[in-house]
């Protein structure tokens, strides 16, 4: 994952009196990730796919809030699971291409 870092080691000639150039006292690593998809908004609620759907935003204050996960169809369109579940109660097709909906992946 991470490459090995080059470390300066004192040579034999400077071993006694050499000082370190610097010393790392603290290091706070920061990382960011994102889904590798072309469309990054849920076409149903219009929220960013990485953000909470409107249903989860409304229930955010309650202690029983679930994870807001992403659902992928075989057509490779992604929606919040809550949004597509609510959509599928009335129509069994993808909201974007009108093909019959079938789950390909579900979750993070």
UniProtKB/Swiss-Prot annotation:
It comes from Salmo salar (Atlantic salmon). The keyword Methyltransferase does not apply. Zn(2+) 2 binds at residues 53, 56, 68, 82. E3 ubiquitin ligase component of multiple cullin-RING-based E3 ubiquitin-protein ligase (CRLs) complexes which mediate the ubiquitination and subsequent proteasomal degradation of target proteins, including proteins involved in cell cycle progression, signal transduction, transcription and transcription-coupled nucleotide excision repair. CRLs complexes and ARIH1 collaborate in tandem to mediate ubiquitination of target proteins, ARIH1 mediating addition of the first ubiquitin on CRLs targets. It is found in: Cytoplasm; Nucleus. Part of SCF complexes, which consist of skp1, cul1, rbx1 and a F-box protein. Interacts with ube2m. PROSITE patterns: ZF_RING_2 (PS50089). Zn(2+) 1 binds at residues 42, 45, 80. Keywords: Cytoplasm, Metal-binding, Nucleus, Stress response, Transferase, Ubl conjugation pathway, Zinc, Zinc-finger. Expressed in heart and kidney. This is E3 ubiquitin-protein ligase RBX1. The RING-type zinc finger domain is essential for ubiquitin ligase activity. It coordinates an additional third zinc ion. Pathway: Protein modification; protein ubiquitination; Protein modification; protein neddylation. It catalyses: S-ubiquitinyl-[E2 ubiquitin-conjugating enzyme]-L-cysteine + [acceptor protein]-L-lysine = [E2 ubiquitin-conjugating enzyme]-L-cysteine + N(6)-ubiquitinyl-[acceptor protein]-L-lysine; S-[NEDD8-protein]-yl-[E2 NEDD8-conjugating enzyme]-L-cysteine + [cullin]-L-lysine = [E2 NEDD8-conjugating enzyme]-L-cysteine + N(6)-[NEDD8-protein]-yl-[cullin]-L-lysine. Induction: During hyperosmotic stress and thermal stress. Belongs to the RING-box family. Its EC number is 2.3.2.27, 2.3.2.32. GO terms for cellular component: Cul3-RING ubiquitin ligase complex; Cul4A-RING E3 ubiquitin ligase complex; Cul4B-RING E3 ubiquitin ligase complex; Cul7-RING ubiquitin ligase complex; cytoplasm; nucleus; SCF ubiquitin ligase complex. GO terms for biological process: proteasome-mediated ubiquitin-dependent protein catabolic process; protein monoubiquitination; protein neddylation; protein ubiquitination; RNA polymerase II transcription initiation surveillance; SCF-dependent proteasomal ubiquitin-dependent protein catabolic process. Pfam families: zf-rbx1.
